[in-house]
């Protein structure tokens, strides 16, 4: 497991600045948040087609990794299932292009029934996981929302039993929301924890 920070909420920084911050703070990587921002969209962006190779070279020169892409969608939102699938498939495509091993999924804190959440998430993962498996990318469900109770996340992960579907341990959510100790998280998730 590598120590990395997310670019979430840092909209006024360049990717070079993120790399400098990570290197200065002795982090091992950076997590990319929001594939719709300028870094991916604009022709001057660090990950636009022609700039991506140079950006990756700078990352490797600083001995950093891009740990994961953080999907914006809420996989539990069944009303947005089609848009969520498109976003996750795009995340997988970008991950392949940029040699990023993981795509993070995060269930929101919306007021939905547990069965609705499991149904929506299972349906979405079953549509995206085959592409991720084919491309060697892992989908990681964060320990947030309903899944801050890591026994529920284990139940979901067990239902797929795929090497390309694992857990992303959000320390604060599992501790403060789920009220779980690190020992309990590892007891429930074990080898499913990838990041």
Please name every model-derived segment.
Residues 102, 126-195:
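Acidic/histidine-rich catalytic cores of soluble enzymes
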Residues 38-43, 75-79, 109-115, 175-179:
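A short acidic, helix-capping loop that chelates divalent metal ions and anchors anionic groups
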Residues 1-101, 126, 162, 191-193:
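N-terminal pre-domain/capping segments
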Residues 6-10, 33-37, 71-74, 108-110, ...:
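Active-site beta-loop-alpha junctions enriched in small/polar residues
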Residues 52-53, 122, 150:
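Short, surface-exposed alpha-helical segments at coil->helix boundaries
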Residues 95-115, 135-144:
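Active-site groove signature of glycoside hydrolases
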Residues 18-20, 45-47, 82-85, 117-120, ...:
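Short, glycine/charged-enriched secondary-structure capping and boundary segments
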Residues 111-125:
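Active-site cleft segment of glycoside hydrolase catalytic domains centered on the general acid/base Glu
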């Amino acid at each position: 497991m590598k120590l990395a920070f997310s670019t979430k909420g840092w909209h006024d920084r360049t990717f070079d600045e993120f790399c400098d911050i990570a290197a200065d703070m002795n982090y091992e990587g950076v997590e990319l948040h929001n594939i719709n921002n300028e870094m991916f969209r604009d022709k001057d962006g660090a990950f636009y087609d022609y700039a991506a190779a140079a950006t990756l070279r700078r990352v490797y020169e600083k001995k950093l990794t891009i740990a994961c892409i953080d999907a914006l969608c809420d996989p539990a939102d069944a009303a947005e299932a089609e848009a969520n699938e498109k976003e996750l498939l795009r995340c997988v495509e970008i991950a392949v292009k940029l040699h990023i091993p993981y795509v993070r999924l995060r269930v929101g804190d919306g007021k939905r029934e547990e069965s609705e959440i499991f149904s929506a998430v299972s349906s979405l993962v079953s549509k995206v996981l085959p592409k991720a498996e084919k491309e060697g990318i892992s989908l990681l469900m964060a320990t947030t929302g309903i899944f801050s109770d890591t026994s529920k996340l284990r139940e979901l992960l067990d239902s797929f039993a795929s090497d390309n579907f694992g857990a992303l341990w959000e320390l604060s959510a599992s501790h403060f929301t789920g009220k779980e100790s690190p020992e309990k998280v590892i007891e429930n998730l074990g080898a499913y924890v990838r990041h």
